[in-house]
Amino acid sequence: MKKIFLLNYAPPSSSIYKYSQRIYECTSEYSEQINLRYSNRSNKWEQTVQGRIFESPVKNVLSANILFSSVFFRNARKYILNSSGKDRVVHYTHQTLSPFKFDLERSVVSIHDNPYTGLKYGVYTSDRQNTIDKMMFRLYSRSIKHNLARYMKFKYVITTSDYVKNSLIKYGFRNEITTIYPPVGNQFVPIEGKEKIREELKLPRDKRLLLSVSTDQPRKNLKLLEQLMKRLDKSFQLVRVGKPILNSINFSNVDQQTINKIYNACDVLVMPSFEEGFGSPVAEALTVGLPVACSDIEIFHELCGKYAFYFDPNSVEDFERSVTTAVENLDLYKDKMIERSSNFSHLTFCSNINNYYDQKFFM
């Protein structure tokens, strides 16, 4: 019997949970979502999560996931064994999950990040010069290296971009690696009437709105964005989905319809990141036809091709040039961007992931 177990560890608000959920939406006839919960800080697990929840008695993520996962989550492994046959497939939806002991040829992992930058202090984690932080990061990085070594024994690996795929090959992976781009949510669609949307969202109608959607991790390079906003004149206004920057207009915990309206209300998406494994905001901007001013890094070229305004992420002068050029050419790439966004549609993703499972495991 065709059966796939999707193992997730992330809370419902996270991009990793959404990735797991999107796979489930495409494969619900023969898949089941297994959620390994280390903590309930968001207090939303039971209300919003799909699938079964298996809870660790220990709330320390490092201990629960890395050091003793086979002990703390033995009920999850037992459930999978008892509710399926040998033809089961176990899909770990993120590389930080510590794998259980299942058939390596019927297991697959999705790896979302370049292992080199993911293991570098101050890229995905705080760059504070703090001894305790550094000690914890050393423990964390050792555990991730241990996980990666175990995943290198798998027959199959999925990556979210060719950039990550190439980094894994360089790292030493000799598995059968396949790139399947994550999908953009169905809520992202172009909307006419920018002024009306701005009025509804209480955004200024007489400003050039620059949109920034990100966490505040060091790799997001928000210091450069702050420098940019200090240089630009008052005709520009920053709109942030995330923590505030200077006098930005801020949104948080917005619903699906509102986030789409925010994209459609703004003039340019700004992405000064040093490092991304994929870069969902860029794919979302392409989908609605919002011009993108982004770092001149490999992953953004993979997503946007020639239909973006690139800049050196170490130069605020180049960032300013890129943004002003984008503002002066708002419709230059719009049609080509929307056309290119089909690579990241939910329909394309569903077709790719179902074909992948069939070809690798159920032929």
Task: Locate predicted features.
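Conserved acidic donor-binding segment of nucleotide-sugar-dependent glycosyltransferases
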Residues: 309-316, 323-330
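Acidic anion/phosphate-binding donor-loop and adjacent secondary structure
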Residues: 175, 183-200
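Active-site donor-binding segments of glycosyltransferases and PAPS-dependent sulfotransferases
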Residues: 5-99
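Short hydrophobic beta-strand element within catalytic cores of glycosyltransferases
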Residues: 287, 291-294
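Conserved donor-binding/catalytic core segment of Leloir-type glycosyltransferases
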Residues: 204-220, 226-229
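Short alpha-helical donor nucleotide-sugar binding micro-motif in glycosyltransferases
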Residues: 261-266
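Membrane-proximal helix-turn-helix segments that form the acceptor-binding/catalytic region
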Residues: 132-157
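Aromatic "clamp/platform" in nucleotide-sugar-dependent glycosyltransferases that forms part
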Residues: 274, 286
